[in-house]
Each structure stands twice: as C-alpha cells, then as structure tokens.
C-alpha cells in the first residue's frame, strides 16, 4: 500500500526567498532555470492554497509569509521573540511537508491524465482533479485541529514538481498565546518522539480513504532493524527532503544572481554619473585658471572675471 509522508523542519523565522519558494513567486526567468530541478512551469497554474474554513483559492503571491506572520501576530497582540535581535534565536516557524507515495499522489492530483514528467515537457493542458482538493481540505482540517487554525500562515499545494505535496507553514503558539516549540512540537528526546508518532498515527486516520497508509519515520526506524522495504521508504523520504533543501538553495542563488545583476547596473550608472561630474569639474577648473590668467595679463578686469565665473 502507498505510504503517507510527514516532514517537519523548524526555522527561526522565514526569509523572503523561502516564502517565494513556498508561494511560487518566481520571475519567468527563474522558473525556467528550475526546469532541470524537477519543477515544471507548465503545471504551475495547478497549484492552490487552502485558507480559513477549508476554502480552495489560487496561491496569494502578493502577501509573503513573513508579512502574513507580522499581520497575524499584530492582530492577536503577540510579540515575535526574534524581533529586534541581531540574530534570530527562537524557533518560531514549523515548515511541514505532507504528502505520500509518488504514484498515489499523482493519481489524486491528475487522475488518468497522461502527464509527461520529462524535463521541458508541455503539460499546460492538464487539469487538476477533485481528489487532490478533497485530500488537501481534509489535511488542512487535520492541521487546524492539531495546531490551531489561527496558527496556520500558509497551506500551499504544489503540483508542479515530480511528487504532489503540501507546504504548510505554522507558528508553534500555545493556548496562552506564547511561542513554545517544545510544548507544541518538541520537548525532550522521548517526548518529541512520542509527539511525532502520535502525529503520524492521527494523520494515518485521515489518509485511509485516500489510499495512504501510515509511513515510517526516522525517529522510529533508526539505523537498525529495518527491512529492505522500510529502508527504501526511509531513503525516499530523505532524498525528497534533501532534494527540496537543494532546490531551495538553488532558488536563493538564482535570486541573488538577479540582485547582483541589478546592483551591477546601478553601479555602472553611478560610475558614469561620477565620471561626468568629474569631467564637468575639471572643465570648470580649467575655465577658472584661464580667467585668472587673462586677469593677470590685463585682458579682462576683476569685475569681468567675477561675472564670468558666476555664469
């Protein structure tokens, strides 16, 4: 049976680049550069967001996740513990990836349509199936019940990669409106392991009707006593996580390259401006020297020299 996948990564806030990756806010050039990294821009339009109340909407690229976080906290009167710090210290964001075995997730997303997953293929004719929307809404409801709907900053479904999945961004805020990673998601070693096991168990109940069985996780399988199939499943999860991490870093590099190009253009413009000003200054100095020489030679009066300098 197909397996479910859950991966949770803590971060001390979120950068604009990370937000752009989650929300698919890319320039056309950046998206095209990612074709070789399991991204298909011709399927970008299939992605969607699940928002409050379980509503399916297009991905809102106009409000970044850091902006959403700031607005959310301000409305609730909660202070970001990393605000004002030279370097962020507190884990205020949980990035959760939810999905399952590739073939089953593709069936939910695309049904029996003939999707070409080769790099450079044109899949603009593909439509999104209702199955992935129903799974996403049930998964959103599960996360909302588990962590509080008010703590969900983004719940984005990506259908432009090799394996359809959810990127969910939540804040670990407790019932007292305080950030507490340990209370919500972590704790000491055994406590953290137990919470993750419970999360897997509860998510498996949601996934039953979608043909996804409870998956194994690193905390439970460890490095020993794995069957070949368990080891393959663990490797798939690790490869998927590392693939996403690498893609994120490539995206950051791509964006930095664009910023460097813009900066180089600005520097070139400023250099030209400085050169022009220096040339003008030198011409004026030459003109002053010429006027002073004419005055010393008696060809012009002091008044004439001053008047010409004023011009």
What are these regions (language model features)?
Residues 1-311:
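N-terminal nicking endonuclease/strand-transfer module with a His-rich metal-binding environment
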